[in-house]
Regions:
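The conserved phosphate-sensing helix
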Residues: 36-41, 46-57, 98
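Short, conserved acidic/polar surface loops in the N-terminal third of protein domains
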Residues: 1-3, 28, 57
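Short polybasic/polar patches that bind polyanions
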Residues: 30, 46, 118
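Conserved small helical "lid"/interfacial subdomain of P-loop NTPases
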Residues: 14-40
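Short aromatic/basic micro-patch
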Residues: 19, 49, 157
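Short regulatory helix/loop adjacent to the ATP-binding pocket of P-loop NTPases
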Residues: 1-12
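Accessory nucleic acid-recognition modules appended to NTPase machines
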Residues: 52-206
């Protein structure tokens, strides 16, 4: 939409695609003969978000943990390199976008623009404004007011489940399989954060 070259002003109508809700994911799993209880369904959302393309990659013969291993942890798994591939396909120079997300992944309550700009890899100015706007428009982050930390001050928070999962467990990889992470301190920390994101993305339903 903001392209300055040949495609500028040639958009007839923007379409804002949003991830599936938990209910829609449940319908998709049923269509694909994927058997899960509600707890597993929520955890699958905590990992993959409501992205139907990712959910269609599930193998019905495997458990949720086995699907996570096959798709994300195997060297040639379909989603092993998805985190980097996604952002390099979306943005010409995604390095600062990635730096913003990786910093926000460390702060579940969010950070102000000023706090983000103090990071050497992020910086400030109009570039930060543009990058934050692009990430918000794509649904990776949200901007909100947190009146418990300062009246009227705007905060930015990571709200994309797959991005959080990828940063915590794929980019900063400590183990070779999802099974090794389960019940580790890092797993429980992520689980609390990811569950909050799922709830936040389902406020109308809740």
């Amino acid at each position: 939409l903001t392209n300055k070259k040949g495609f500028h002003n040639r958009i007839t109508r923007p379409i804002h695609l949003v991830p599936f809700s938990l209910a829609e994911c449940e319908e998709l799993f049923e269509l694909n003969d994927i058997v899960m209880n509600r707890s597993q369904m929520i955890e699958s959302y905590m990992v993959f978000g409501g992205i139907p393309h990712y959910l269609n990659l599930f193998d019905s013969r495997l458990s949720l943990a086995q699907n996570v291993n096959e798709l994300c942890f195997k060297e040639y798994g379909f989603l092993h390199d998805e985190y980097n591939n996604l952002f390099y396909s979306l943005y010409d120079k995604p390095e600062k976008h990635l730096a913003i997300l990786e910093r926000l992944a460390k702060s579940r309550d969010g950070l102000t623009r000023a706090e983000l700009s103090r990071e050497k890899e992020i910086g400030g100015g109009s570039v930060l404004t543009k990058d934050l706007r692009e990430l918000e428009e794509c649904g990776f982050i949200r901007k909100f007011s947190n009146f418990t930390r300062g009246e009227g001050e705007q905060f930015y928070q990571l709200i994309d489940p797959f991005t959080l999962f990828s940063i915590r467990f794929i980019k900063n990889k400590k183990f070779d399989s999802w099974n090794e992470y389960i019940n580790s301190p890092g797993y429980h920390s992520w689980r609390g954060n990811a569950f909050e994101i799922v709830c936040m993305n389902h406020i109308p339903q809740i």
